[in-house]
Amino acid sequence: MERFKKASSIIETLKQQGHEAYFVGGSVRDLIIDRPIGDIDIATSALPEEVMAIFPRNVPVGLEHGTVIVVENGEPYEVTTFRTESEYEDFRRPSSVQFVRSLEEDLKRRDFTMNAIAMTEEGKMVDLFAGQEAIQQREIVTVGNAADRFQEDALRMMRGIRFVSTLGFSLEMKTKQAIETYGHLLEHIAIERITVEFEKLLTGTYCVKGLKELVETKLFSHLPYLQMSEERLLKATQYKWDSFETDIEAWAFFLYCIGEEHPSVFLRQWKFSNKKIKDIVAVLLTIRTRKEKDWDTVLLYKTGIHIAEMAERVYEAMIERYDPTSVERVQSMFHALPIQERQEMNVTGNDLLNWANKKPGPWVAEMLQKIEEAIVQGNVVNEKERIREWLQGCNLL
């Protein structure tokens, strides 16, 4: 409750000015579940311009949606006016937002009952839709009619399955049936928004449970490159997913599990950045080599510690060994390398030109590569004169 206490002065100030105000959303849910608290959000009957007048230190980030960031005690908090939404367009966004003075009207537009609980600054719960009961039953239940909620915003179906993965809850029967019925509406949603939810699914503590729900509801059949992947997705549920430390590892393992032969094409369809695609593909390529042989100095040096650590964790999951010392061994080997990157070499192309008395050309880069490999393999000490002597001894100068 300590973090809520820091923000409670905002609620107290709003109430002193004659407005209602409550803590709402995921932070209240996580407090009840006893999970780490994320961002703390506040809902109020005050209109955005009233909030801005009361709190001079503010950032009007989303006035059309009624949201103002208020800075209090050095911390930013989202303060949003109670609102209701009109008909939705394209199954993803409301055609208009109306500000209201009713907490109930605000809460009833939310996706799931566990996310529709408000809390006073004293810690009293305002639970109009049995959200606490759903949490106690470990169930994900829509607020009101599931069909209506999913037709308003089809992304809520992915959010529901994401919560299965992150919380370990189960989909309530009618909620699950509605996902099966309206799953096709997900095709109206921008893939970038789906990717965010799917990544949270893959990195959730209960990822296997989430993937099973993805299959059982048939929602996977409306996702890019997964339309015919039921058996491959079920294969992915046979592994443990709790040893990964990054989203890169989770995606690499997922692509391995489903046997994706063209990972770059798959990831581009999911709108990943070039950097992220490069890292995921690098992990997959490293695993392919790792399956054939153990780490050696050259492989580790060329791979780099960042990719090597991730690849080793994924490899451990693949062979179902889960030995934490394997990554420690990789780290020890890497730190014992004579050099860890080319910039650490104590010789340059100019040195080679001076020693050989030859014109510049491709031979310089080729020679530097040979020296680099020799240093990494321990065949020559990384000192300028020792390198020159080694080159002369190998008749390379």
Swiss-Prot record:
BP GO annotations: RNA repair; tRNA 3'-terminal CCA addition; tRNA processing
Sites where the protein binds ATP: 26, 29, 110, 153, 156, 159, 162
This enzyme's EC code(s): 2.7.7.72
Biological role stated in the UniProt entry: Catalyzes the addition and repair of the essential 3'-terminal CCA sequence in tRNAs without using a nucleic acid template. Adds these three nucleotides in the order of C, C, and A to the tRNA nucleotide-73, using CTP and ATP as substrates and producing inorganic pyrophosphate. tRNA 3'-terminal CCA addition is required both for tRNA processing and repair. Also involved in tRNA surveillance by mediating tandem CCA addition to generate a CCACCA at the 3' terminus of unstable tRNAs. While stable tRNAs receive only 3'-terminal CCA, unstable tRNAs are marked with CCACCA and rapidly degraded.
Cofactor(s), by name: Mg(2+)
Membership in a protein family: Belongs to the tRNA nucleotidyltransferase/poly(A) polymerase family. Bacterial CCA-adding enzyme type 3 subfamily.
Other notes: A single active site specifically recognizes both ATP and CTP and is responsible for their addition.
Class of this enzyme: transferase
Name by which UniProt lists this protein: CCA-adding enzyme
Organism, scientific name: Bacillus cereus (strain ATCC 14579 / DSM 31 / CCUG 7414 / JCM 2152 / NBRC 15305 / NCIMB 9373 / NCTC 2599 / NRRL B-3711)
InterPro entries reported in the protein's UniProt record: Bact_CCA-adding_enz_type3_sf, CCA-adding_enz_C, CCA-adding_enz_firmicutes, NT_sf, PolA_pol_head_dom, PolyA_RNA-bd
Record: residues binding CTP: 26, 29, 110, 153, 156, 159, 162
Gene name of the record: cca
Catalyzed reaction equations: a tRNA precursor + 2 CTP + ATP = a tRNA with a 3' CCA end + 3 diphosphate; a tRNA with a 3' CCA end + 2 CTP + ATP = a tRNA with a 3' CCACCA end + 3 diphosphate
Pfam entry (one): PolyA_pol
GO-annotated molecular function: ATP binding; CCA tRNA nucleotidyltransferase activity; magnesium ion binding; tRNA binding
Description of how the protein assembles with itself and partners: Homodimer.
